[in-house]
């Protein structure tokens, strides 16, 4: 390699400076991750070269044997990671090593918790793994040449992690990237063959290409070979191609960490080989925690796609529906061509068939997790439940299966935890109950004592309590389960069917008829604020509630539409009153029209508050309430 030419000194992006400070001063509790990250990057570089060489075989430059080499020099106190992958041009080195184009650094810094171990785990997830080199090194030199460029267009990038880096042109005959870490004082333990082999075995045994180290020579100096001999220190076979019976749980876990850039273990995995009309192998994982960008429109999602063990692309989104975007893994097909593109993957019988099978496989994996490890499934639900709730709208064919995986709060569990599955709910149905009842609201605390639940408590009927913002939208698609319809207890004229006896229904009709005059007076007092006034069959303790019209939007959907800037159709609630409540009896007896109107409006406003709605005229409510309280105190 020749002397550096055309040397420049450039400054790091502001966020990268912050990141470097973090690496240098804070993340020292798990230093060995630097090797995991740099080897993982080298493996990605090899994958990219394989893919580009499908179209341009000349990029292999006569050498298709891809490998990663890890070496060390005790005297010089250096560790070197060398690959013959795709390599970098000068422009690549400046843009990839001096800035983070996708704002990954800013997001990384935003998610730091101050817990060293947790923060170290975030490094790979946010695509900033290269900078982990500065955990153990006070200077990092990178020598690289992109495949296809002439030897004279190599690049030397160098930095001490202090806000600036140098970049220069060098001659580099061989393609790929060599990273030289100059170890800090006190980090000499990493300039040791056994230490490095141990770390590679721990983190990188699953990497699908050879990771080589120099053979240790323990004999006489005269017997030492003139050229160093290299030996693979990992299995160097794609994990998913091996028989399941030969793979340990720890190997699956390390492979997941490699492909997901996550230092935590997965909650579950499913490894399957399909033979017959279609031939492919899949290895799918359920992560233990949600990525920071799970709900971002442009977040990374999809599986790693291989064709006959040749890497084709990351984030192949076409093999799983959007509601399963949290699933990580690989799919290796024998039925797709090596020159497959994202456009080709958009449709076609092979892709459609694989998507259908992989979707079912993912849902089966979640069912097994829920059955065998309910505590782990509770963790999954906390992290990914809202994404799964998108399923019934997107995947009609699997709607029942998805519904069975959902968990909700209910009146059966007073902790408020989302722990109740629909199958459990159905198993507890009251005698004669043929409907599944639910109530939506902003929070468990807000709806657990809702007046809408009073008649259900009286009859001992369980009601699901749905408090995620997406729930009302979800229930517009999830209309039944196990052959039974869902009923919103706050919507329309509640009909309990067989849960009410014929005598009960007859008595309700008689009461409603006897209170028609009161209903008309209240409607006149409330005017355009309500669509209708009627006697309630829902209430046992409260004086009044607001019911949602059968075809109207509920509060959650109105808020969702407003938040997204969409027009919200106008709707008016139905005012229902409890004819046996003392306040309603007092209202019925009130002859003073002003007092009647004030009391009616106060009852309406209280019902709105109980439903979680805001008041149009809070000052008017307070004024009327104070007036009534003052009259009572006289």
UniProtKB/Swiss-Prot annotation:
GO cellular component, one term: cytoplasm
Assigned keywords, A-Z: ATP-binding, Chaperone, Cytoplasm, Nucleotide-binding, Stress response
Classification via Gene3D superfamilies: 3.30.230.80, 3.40.50.11260, Heat shock protein 90, C-terminal domain, Histidine kinase-like ATPase, C-terminal domain
GO molecular function, one term: ATP hydrolysis activity
Pfam families the record matches: HATPase_c_3, HSP90
SUPFAM superfamilies: ATPase domain of HSP90 chaperone/DNA topoisomerase II/histidine kinase, HSP90 C-terminal domain, Ribosomal protein S5 domain 2-like
Location in the cell: Cytoplasm
HAMAP family from the UniProt entry: HSP90
Family: Belongs to the heat shock protein 90 family.
Name the record gives this protein: Chaperone protein HtpG
Organism (species): Xanthomonas oryzae pv. oryzae (strain KACC10331 / KXO85)
């Amino acid at each position: 390699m020749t002397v550096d030419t055309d040397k420049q000194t450039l400054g790091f992006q502001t966020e990268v400076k912050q990141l470097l400070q973090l690496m240098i001063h804070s993340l020292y509790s798990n230093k060995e991750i630097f090797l995991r990250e740099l080897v993982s990057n080298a493996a990605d570089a090899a994958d990219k070269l394989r893919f580009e060489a499908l179209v341009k075989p000349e990029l292999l430059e006569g050498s298709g044997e891809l490998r990663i080499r890890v070496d060390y020099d005790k005297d010089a106190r250096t560790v070197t990671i060398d690959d013959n992958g795709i390599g970098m041009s000068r422009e690549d080195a400046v843009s990839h090593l001096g800035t983070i184009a996708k704002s990954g650094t800013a997001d990384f810094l935003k998610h730091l918790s101050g817990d060293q171990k947790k923060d170290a785990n975030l490094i790979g997830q946010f695509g900033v793994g290269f900078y982990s080199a500065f955990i153990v090194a006070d200077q990092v030199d990178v020598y690289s040449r992109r495949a296809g460029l002439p030897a004279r267009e190599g690049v030397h990038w160098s930095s001490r992690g202090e806000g600036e880096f140098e970049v220069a042109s060098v001659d580099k005959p061989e393609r790929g990237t060599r990273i030289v870490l100059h170890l800090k004082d006190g980090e000499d333990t990493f300039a040791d063959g056994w230490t490095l082999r141990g770390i590679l075995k721990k983190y990188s045994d699953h990497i699908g290409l050879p990771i080589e180290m120099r053979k240790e020579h323990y004999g006489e100096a005269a017997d030492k070979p003139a050229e160093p001999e290299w030996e693979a220190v990992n299995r160097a076979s794609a994990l998913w191609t091996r028989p399941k019976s030969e793979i340990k749980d720890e190997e699956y876990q390390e492979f997941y960490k490699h492909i997901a850039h996550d230092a935590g273990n997965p909650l579950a995995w499913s490894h399957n080989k399909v033979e017959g009309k279609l031939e492919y192998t899949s290895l799918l994982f359920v992560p233990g925690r949600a990525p920071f960008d799970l709900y971002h429109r442009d977040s990374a999602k999809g599986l790693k796609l291989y064709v006959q063990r040749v890497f084709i692309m990351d984030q192949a989104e076409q093999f799983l529906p959007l509601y399963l975007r949290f699933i990580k893994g690989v799919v290796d097909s024998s039925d797709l061509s090596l020159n497959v593109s994202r456009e080709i993957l958009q449709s076609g019988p092979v892709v459609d068939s694989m998507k259908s099978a992989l979707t079912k496989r993912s849902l089966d994996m979640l069912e097994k997790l829920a059955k065998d490890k309910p505590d782990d499934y509770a963790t999954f639900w906390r992290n990914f439940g809202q994404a799964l709730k998108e399923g019934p709208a997107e995947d009609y064919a699997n709607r029942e299966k998805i519904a069975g995986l959902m968990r909700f709060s209910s009146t059966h569990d007073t902790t408020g935890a989302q722990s109740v599955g629909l199958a459990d709910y159905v198993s507890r149905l009251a005698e004669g109950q043929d409907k599944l009842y639910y109530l939506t609201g902003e929070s468990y605390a807000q709806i657990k004592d809702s007046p809408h639940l009073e008649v259900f408590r009286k009859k001992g009927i369980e009601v699901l309590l749905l408090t995620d913002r997406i729930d009302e939208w979800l229930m517009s698609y999830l209309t039944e389960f196990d052959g039974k319809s869902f009923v919103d207890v706050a919507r329309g004229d509640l009909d309990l069917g067989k849960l009410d006896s014929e005598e009960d229904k007859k008595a309700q009709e008689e009461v409603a008829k006897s209170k028609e005059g009161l209903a008309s007076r209240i409607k006149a007092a409330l005017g355009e604020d309500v669509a209708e006034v009627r006697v309630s069959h829902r209430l046992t303790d409260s004086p009044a509630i607001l019911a949602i019209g059968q075809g109207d939007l509920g509060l959650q959907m109105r808020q969702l539409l407003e938040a997204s800037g969409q027009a919200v159709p106008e709707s008016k609630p139905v005012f229902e009153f409890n004819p046996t409540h003392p306040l309603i009896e007092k209202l019925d007896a009130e002859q003073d029209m002003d007092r009647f109107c004030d009391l009616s409006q106060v009852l309406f406003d209280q019902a709105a508050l109980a439903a979680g709605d805001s008041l149009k005229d809070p000052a008017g409510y307070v004024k009327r309430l104070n007036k009534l309280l003052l009259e009572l105190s006289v």
